[in-house]
Amino acid sequence: DPLLSIAVAFLILKSAWALVQQSGHVLLEGAPAWLDRDEMQQKIIERVPEVTGIHHVHVWGLTPQDLMLTMHVRIAPEASDLTGVVRRVKATLKDDYGIGHSTIETETADCADH
């Protein structure tokens, strides 16, 4: 009986471990493992020509389906429609990555945080 109890306990732990890992990742608001930030930044720069650089990117999930993002986006000095640029960046994030809530800080000069 003790050996059988240990075997059952091991099976329960083994099957629950993935759920514990995923739950811990969500509770700690970790970044989604599938998201390639470099690829995402490159895609935004290609789709929105007024964007000349991206940094300070932070992505986390409140749930596996509810992703949040903050980023700094450097805008070309000659860009005139900053609101339109931000809308296109947000559309790319939502359409391609499912990031429905994003905060985009625009910069036309050096970042004040550096």
Model-derived features: positions:
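Alpha-helical transmembrane segments and adjacent TM-loop junctions that form the membrane-embedded core
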Residues: 1-114
